């Protein structure tokens, strides 16, 4: 029951009606029997500053930020975590002592989803497909302990991102980059961060051919609708282990949840709540 002591968290973006975040967060809240509620707010860019001020005034515990505000929100925050600053995007804000503090949990969400399948990720050869916003967070996190190659249809964009991450992480060996015609046979992990294959455009060619994939490779697609996008169907044909975007969605959400509440939510409860709605 909502009352004067209910703690508020939520999602800010445009649009937000497609989001599964309220479903999984409220499922975790119900499971833990804590007096929180998670709401989704459709917010235009010109209102971002007022929304941050309003969240402080109404004593929100925090909120998630989704497309298209992950970068623009940063100028209205009081503090930004060093990783989020380096990534150049924020997806989680905590309100504490009247201050709005920004974090980015997208990269750690992918890492945790992968480690659920592979164990600890160290010195793996990882191929990242795409160089957009999702790729930035994922590449930054995974490049800390692994050997990354970023590829994109526009090679210049892949080059720029790889050089930026190498510089920010002070990498002794710079990240590699290339085009979509890359030889994939030596990669342990391949991650698609592009929207190719997302509903409703599901009947498309995989973003890169996978016929030369390493026998024991792990292939991940950040898409979660459909649950098995064309990229993963193709990877499975060649014997790869596959992971869809549900894992990333849930784990990044779980890290956000813990930032706000100080409590680790049940990953299974969150995942089950989403799958039941797809």
Curated annotation (Swiss-Prot):
Q: Which UniProt keywords apply?
A: Amino-acid biosynthesis, Aromatic amino acid biosynthesis, NADP, Oxidoreductase
Question: What's a BP term from Gene Ontology annotated to this protein?
Answer: chorismate biosynthetic process
Q: Which Pfam families does this entry report, sorted A to Z?
A: SDH_C, Shikimate_DH, Shikimate_dh_N
Q: Where is the active site?
A: 70
Q: Where does the chain bind NADP(+)?
A: 130-134, 222, 245
Tell me the superkingdom of the source.
Answer: Archaea
**Subunit-structure text:** Homodimer.
What InterPro entries does the record point to? Aminoacid_DH-like_N_sf, NAD(P)-bd_dom_sf, SDH_C, Shikimate_DH, Shikimate_DH-bd_N, Shikimate_DH_fam, Shikm_DH/Glu-tRNA_Rdtase
GO MF annotation: an example: shikimate 3-dehydrogenase (NADP+) activity
Annotated shikimate binding sites: 19-21, 66, 91, 106, 224
Instruction: Describe its function.
Output: Involved in the biosynthesis of the chorismate, which leads to the biosynthesis of aromatic amino acids. Catalyzes the reversible NADPH linked reduction of 3-dehydroshikimate (DHSA) to yield shikimate (SA).
- Give the catalysed reaction(s), semicolon-separated: shikimate + NADP(+) = 3-dehydroshikimate + NADPH + H(+)
Which pathway or pathways does this protein act in?
Metabolic intermediate biosynthesis; chorismate biosynthesis; chorismate from D-erythrose 4-phosphate and phosphoenolpyruvate: step 4/7
EC number of the protein:
1.1.1.25
What top-tier enzyme class does this entry carry?
oxidoreductase
What protein name does the entry list? Shikimate dehydrogenase (NADP(+))
- Similarity annotation: Belongs to the shikimate dehydrogenase family.
Which organism does this record belong to? Methanococcus maripaludis (strain DSM 14266 / JCM 13030 / NBRC 101832 / S2 / LL)
Q: Which cysteines are joined by disulfide bonds?
A: none
CDD domains, alphabetized: NAD_bind_Shikimate_DH
